């Protein structure tokens, strides 16, 4: 982030996306919402408001200024999938009322809003489903598998695997994610 702050063409604006926002922009990357259960379960109502109201507000901005907009969704929209790996056409096996639903269903609803804004208002939307991202400066206490494994290994502890050990995960390095988001935004 520090190199960006030195760029004269970059401006960092802190704003709650659940509140409408006015700006003149060409592209919007809607990345708002904590992705770790440790953080999003602290205030589940605010979590779902961030996803749903944030999508409505950012889509409204994109419509007003004719900007392209990218929604950062999640692999969690698949729930506990019955198919591995999941094709994009797979709708998932979800629990709409569980303790993680504030995040999962908020992202599903945001995807729906994005497609509806595209169909109804011709807003140029992009949706990506992010899986387990790792890299420098990641939080060590967010309760996700990569950080848990690293901390346990550094502390010379046994690596904890929940379940029967047959689970599968897709991982992506943060630099690859950023490059992928930029490439996706630049597609027609």
Predicted regions and their residues:
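N-terminal Rossmann-like NAD(P)+-binding domain of SDR-like oxidoreductases, especially those catalyzing
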Residues: 1-133, 153, 163, 174-186
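Amphipathic alpha-helical segments in well-structured domains
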Residues: 55, 146-147
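Substrate-binding strand-loop-helix patch
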Residues: 136-143, 165-179
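Nucleotide-binding/hydrolysis machinery
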Residues: 160
């Amino acid at each position: 982030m520090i190199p960006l702050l030195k760029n004269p063409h970059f401006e960092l604006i802190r704003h709650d996306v659940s509140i409408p926002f006015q700006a003149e922009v060409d592209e919007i990357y809607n990345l708002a919402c904590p992705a770790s259960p440790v953080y999003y379960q602290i205030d589940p109502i605010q979590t779902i408001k961030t996803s749903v109201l944030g999508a409505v507000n950012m889509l409204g901005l994109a419509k007003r200024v004719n900007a392209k907009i990218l929604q950062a969704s999640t692999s969690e929209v698949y729930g506990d999938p019955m198919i591995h790996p999941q094709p994009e056409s797979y709708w998932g096996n979800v629990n709409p009322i569980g303790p993680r639903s504030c995040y999962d269903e908020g992202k599903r609803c945001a995807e729906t809003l994005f497609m509806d804004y595209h169909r109804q208002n011709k807003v140029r939307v992009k949706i990506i489903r992010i899986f387990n991202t790792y890299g420098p400066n990641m939080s060590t206490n967010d309760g996700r598998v990569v950080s848990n494994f690293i901390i346990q290994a550094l502390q010379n502890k046994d690596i904890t695997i929940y379940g029967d050990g047959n689970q599968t995960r897709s991982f992506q390095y943060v630099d690859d994610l950023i490059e992928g988001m930029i490439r996706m935004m630049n597609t027609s």
